[in-house]
């Protein structure tokens, strides 16, 4: 019987690999043999439940699973919000397909400790000259050398290979799990099992860390402070104006040890902050990079992004208003809970405030999160100012949306500090405020250089049906037509507007930012 199970488990693996290789549009195309082997090891337990099935049953089951997960999120992005800690749920035997456009280095190193980063670089032959290099500096170095390191490890860089954790000790793995509130069997001493637990949770934890860092920096109101002197260094007086709570939160976010006996003394906290002021400079650059990514122009985005941004923005804003007016279904599906664990405290409060839900000012983040879950189907009672005028007419143009977002800019973007620091970024995007005609023209010219496959994917993102007999010129013309109405230079055909309105008004809102 054991031999039979083994044979069928191996057969399940081959069926899986066959399906992977047959799917030419998937991220698996870029995976190396080592990545595939690692994937199968990661999903070993899930595969075992199919070991008693016949080969034909396995093929049937594998086909059904493939159809079900034709476009799933990567398995590391499956986030259950059943508790305040990160989920430990098993992603399923075929729960992973990822994006071939984004290497895991985008998020992999964000929650690593300084020592782990330094050891990783050293083990993989990357010299770090500065013994006092900050964590952000080490993360940057790791990302810059990621392709070279991945190649040496026989990994593609598009799967969180276990080999990236070779430099971690058992203690390192346990510390990471403990520091990030991940439940695991403390009796487990197997490094392989601990690596597996870290891999299951590291993407979700990285997303949460990003949101928490963003929330903290926004709460510090950096935009209205003169932080840098004329030489570009942190001013000596910056921390004097921070409250004790702000200082404590900032120091703890950078893993600075605080003497518990001195934790309430403002002078002590200021002194500790000044000793670690280099971290604030890292925060500023991180924040500006984040803002740049969030507000970057259409021209720096992928074709898929451009094709979806208008629909997604319109869907989101329309559904927000329609939910307030009681026009949509009162049930928010479980997708709402995806990412809830990464919400900062302010966002949780905003969600509750907009629905008139009362909560104690002393509520912990966990208590607020639980209240949000219970209140997820409550209708909005407080409609943010100036929303209505943009929703009474369901045919608003891109200019309307641009105007709305311009009205809602964060104070940070209007500040002199932002203008000063962003001047380098402005050089990159100096033409982004040109007339919409110029944007559309630029895209039209760009289409000429795209491959036929690029054009097909771009049109697919708009939901445009394409005949199999279409030539490249046909695809270019279709791309131009759909891009022109996206940017407002040509009005979308009436039948398209009708279909989009039906689609937009029928979707349920998942939450709001």
UniProtKB/Swiss-Prot annotation:
Gene Ontology, cellular component aspect: endoplasmic reticulum; mitochondrion; nuclear envelope; plasma membrane
Domain of life of the organism encoding this protein: Eukaryota
Keyword Phosphoprotein carried by entry: yes
InterPro entries per record: Ish1/Msc1-like (IPR018803)
Alphabetical GO biological process terms: protein localization to site of double-strand break; reciprocal meiotic recombination
Post-translational modification Phosphoserine, affected residues: 243
Modified residues (Phosphothreonine): 237
Keywords, sorted A to Z: Phosphoprotein
Note, other: Originally MSC1 was identified in a screen for mutants that show an increase in meiotic unequal sister-chromatid recombination (SCR).
The protein's name in its UniProt record: Meiotic sister chromatid recombination protein 1
């Amino acid at each position: 019987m054991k031999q039979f199970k083994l044979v069928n488990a191996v057969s399940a693996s081959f069926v899986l690999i066959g399906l992977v290789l047959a799917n030419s549009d998937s991220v698996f195309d870029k995976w190396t043999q080592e990545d595939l082997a690692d994937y199968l090891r990661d999903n070993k337990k899930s595969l075992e439940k199919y070991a008693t099935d016949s080969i034909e049953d396995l093929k049937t089951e594998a086909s059904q699973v493939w159809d079900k997960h034709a476009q799933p999120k990567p398995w590391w992005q499956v986030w259950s919000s059943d508790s305040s800690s990160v989920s430990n749920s098993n992603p399923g035997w075929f729960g992973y397909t990822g994006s071939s456009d984004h290497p895991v280095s985008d998020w992999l190193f964000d929650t690593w400790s300084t020592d782990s980063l330094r050891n990783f670089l050293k083990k993989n032959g990357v010299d770090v000259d500065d013994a006092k290099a900050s964590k952000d500096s080490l993360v940057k170095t790791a990302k810059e050398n990621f392709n070279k390191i991945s190649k040496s490890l026989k990994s593609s860089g598009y799967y969180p290979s276990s080999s990236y954790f070779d430099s971690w000790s058992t203690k390192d793995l346990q510390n990471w799990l403990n520091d990030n509130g991940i439940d695991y069997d403390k009796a487990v001493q197997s490094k392989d099992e601990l690596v597996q637990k870290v891999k299951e949770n590291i993407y979700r934890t990285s997303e949460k860390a990003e949101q928490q860092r963003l929330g903290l920096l926004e709460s510090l109101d950096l935009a209205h402070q003169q932080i840098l002197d004329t030489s570009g260094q942190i001013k000596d007086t910056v921390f004097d104006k921070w409250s004790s709570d702000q200082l404590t939160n900032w120091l703890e976010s950078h893993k600075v040890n605080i003497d518990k006996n001195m934790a309430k003394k403002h002078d002590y906290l200021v002194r500790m902050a000044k000793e670690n002021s280099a971290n604030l400079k890292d925060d500023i650059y991180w924040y500006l990079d984040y803002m740049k990514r969030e507000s970057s122009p259409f021209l720096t985005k992928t074709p898929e992004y451009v094709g979806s941004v208008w629909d997604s923005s319109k869907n989101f804003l329309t559904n927000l208003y329609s939910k307030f007016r009681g026009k949509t279904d009162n049930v928010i599906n479980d997708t709402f809970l995806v990412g809830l664990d990464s919400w900062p405290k302010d966002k949780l409060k905003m969600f509750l405030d907009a629905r008139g839900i009362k909560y104690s000012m002393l509520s912990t983040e966990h208590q607020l999160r639980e209240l949000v879950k219970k209140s997820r189907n409550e209708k909005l009672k407080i409609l943010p100012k100036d929303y209505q005028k943009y929703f009474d007419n369901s045919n608003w143009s891109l200019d309307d949306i641009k105007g709305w977002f311009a009205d809602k800019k964060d104070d940070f973007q209007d500040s002199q500090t932002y203008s000063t620091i962003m001047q380098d970024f402005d050089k990159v995007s100096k033409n982004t405020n040109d007339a919409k005609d110029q944007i559309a023209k630029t895209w039209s010219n760009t289409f000429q250089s795209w491959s036929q496959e690029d054009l097909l994917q771009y049109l697919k993102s708009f939901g445009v049906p394409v005949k199999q007999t279409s030539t490249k010129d046909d695809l270019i013309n279709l791309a131009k037509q759909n891009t022109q109405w996206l940017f407002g230079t040509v009005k979308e055909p009436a039948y398209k507007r009708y279909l989009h309105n039906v689609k937009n008004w029928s979707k349920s809102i998942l939450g709001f930012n």
